[in-house]
């Protein structure tokens, strides 16, 4: 029994190679089935995302090259092209790597939480294909526990490091409750969709989506229960908005100073937060001159993000310490399991010797033999049988000139305590 992790990621491989070695939905099932039947593999999990492809296995000794061969052959990739980008971790290094990955410590965005969900899904997929053995099951369950501990004891995921998340975090800081706020989202691209997801997860239920093409906006409207309007309708709905987050590809500003000024008057000068994450800008810079309008540009958010990245690096130090501690503890536990079979076999052998000699002694007593003589013979034979293997080991170590081995055997037998 040995743990092995092989893979490539955004740090080691190009997008082109990552695409070739990815396990899409059509490949994952067959791959897990092949690993389940592989002679060198006891259990496996495949983690495949846009930034990494990794195979975690409980393998028999000497399976490293066999697993690398399998990966290259499965994807029909030349091994010479794969090897420079491939990393291999064994035993505790494999445990530590999985824990680091699941905690977001090996991610493109340090501390990002999405990877944990992806690892959990990978484990679930493997279990569905009966590819998980006891060691792999215990490893991943422990990893999920460690990831939870890292999130609880550190703030590695508590600081916004994406523009979309930073925009929502800023809104949360200014408005105590997003559930009471109306948010106008200008645009309907990936960034605005991500913003909407963050807003919804923080309790925001009143969203208005304004977009040039209504079809795309309707999709977001259905997904988040948002009202849908055209860009031309923004002036009519702007007074309702406590928060405006804009990200379009418009070459010219969509929201001007006069439009916001009019909206503020209709709002009786209740404050309005405008977060412009578009380049070029969607909101005229002069809007920031209005006393009740708080305008933040993508550059303002970037400075927040840069500061938060540095804070995450500080939190990562503690997270790394937790991972080191937990991976070492798990490895110790795993090694103790490896002794279970040997202990079981040793006890079985001793019991068989005892039962055999006891049976013969009882037969002797039944025929009228002297009890004292029978007991002495039993004790002598039992002693000789039980010390036979250790005696041979001591003799072999001495004859082969292996003092270190001799010392270990003496310590094991407790001879140094005599």
From Swiss-Prot:
Annotated GO MF terms? glutamyl-tRNA reductase activity; NADP binding
Which residues of this UniProt protein bind substrate?
49-52, 107, 112-114, 118
What is the native source organism of this protein?
Answer: Vibrio campbellii (strain ATCC BAA-1116)
Role description:
Catalyzes the NADPH-dependent reduction of glutamyl-tRNA(Glu) to glutamate 1-semialdehyde (GSA).
Q: Which family does it belong to?
A: Belongs to the glutamyl-tRNA reductase family.
**Enzyme class, broadest EC rank:** oxidoreductase
Query: What is the name attached to this protein's record?
Result: Glutamyl-tRNA reductase
The protein's annotated catalytic reaction(s) are: (S)-4-amino-5-oxopentanoate + tRNA(Glu) + NADP(+) = L-glutamyl-tRNA(Glu) + NADPH + H(+)
State its Enzyme Commission number(s).
1.2.1.70
What NCBIfam families does the annotation carry? hemA
Binding residue positions for NADP(+): 187-192
């Amino acid at each position: 029994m040995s743990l092995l992790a092989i893979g490539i990621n955004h740090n080691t491989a190009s997008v082109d190679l990552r695409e070739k070695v990815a396990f899409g939905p059509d490949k994952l099932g067959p791959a897990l089935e092949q690993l389940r039947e592989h002679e060198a593999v006891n259990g496996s999990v495949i983690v495949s995302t846009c930034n990494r492809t990794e195979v975690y296995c409980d393998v028999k000794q000497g399976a490293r090259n066999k697993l690398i061969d399998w990966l290259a052959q499965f994807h029909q990739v030349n091994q010479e092209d794969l090897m420079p980008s491939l990393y291999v971790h064994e035993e505790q290094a494999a445990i530590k790597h999985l824990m680091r990955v699941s905690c977001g410590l090996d991610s493109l965005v340090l501390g990002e939480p999405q990877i944990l969900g992806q690892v959990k899904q990978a484990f679930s997929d493997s279990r569905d294909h009966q590819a998980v053995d006891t060691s792999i099951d215990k490893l991943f369950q422990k990893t999920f526990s460690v990831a939870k501990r890292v999130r609880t004891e550190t703030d590695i995921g508590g600081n916004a490091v994406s523009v979309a998340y930073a925009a929502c975090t800023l809104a949360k800081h200014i408005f105590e409750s997003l559930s009471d706020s109306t948010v106008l989202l200008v645009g309907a691209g990936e960034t605005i969709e991500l913003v909407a997801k963050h807003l919804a997860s923080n309790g925001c239920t009143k969203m208005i989506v304004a977009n040039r093409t209504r079809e795309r906006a309707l999709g977001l409207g259905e997904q988040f229960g948002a009202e849908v309007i055209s860009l031309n309708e923004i002036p009519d709905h702007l007074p309702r908005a406590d928060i405006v987050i804009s990200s379009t590809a418009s070459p010219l500003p969509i929201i001007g100073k006069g439009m916001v000024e009019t909206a503020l008057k209709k709002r009786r000068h209740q404050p309005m937060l405008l977060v412009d994450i578009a380049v070029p800008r969607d909101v005229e810079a002069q809007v920031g001159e209005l006393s009740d309008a708080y305008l933040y540009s993508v550059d303002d958010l970037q400075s927040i993000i840069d500061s938060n990245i540095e804070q995450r690096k500080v939190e990562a130090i503690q997270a790394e310490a937790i991972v080191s501690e937990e991976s070492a503890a798990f490895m110790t536990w795993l090694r103790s399991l490896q002794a279970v079979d040997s202990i079981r076999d040793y006890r079985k052998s001793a019991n068989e010797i005892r039962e055999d000699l006891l049976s013969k002694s009882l037969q002797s007593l039944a025929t009228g033999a002297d009890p004292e003589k029978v007991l002495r013979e039993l004790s002598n034979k039992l002693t000789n049988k039980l010390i036979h293997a250790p005696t041979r080991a001591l003799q072999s170590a001495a004859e082969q000139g292996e003092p270190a081995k001799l010392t270990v055997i003496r310590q094991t037998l407790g001879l140094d305590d005599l």
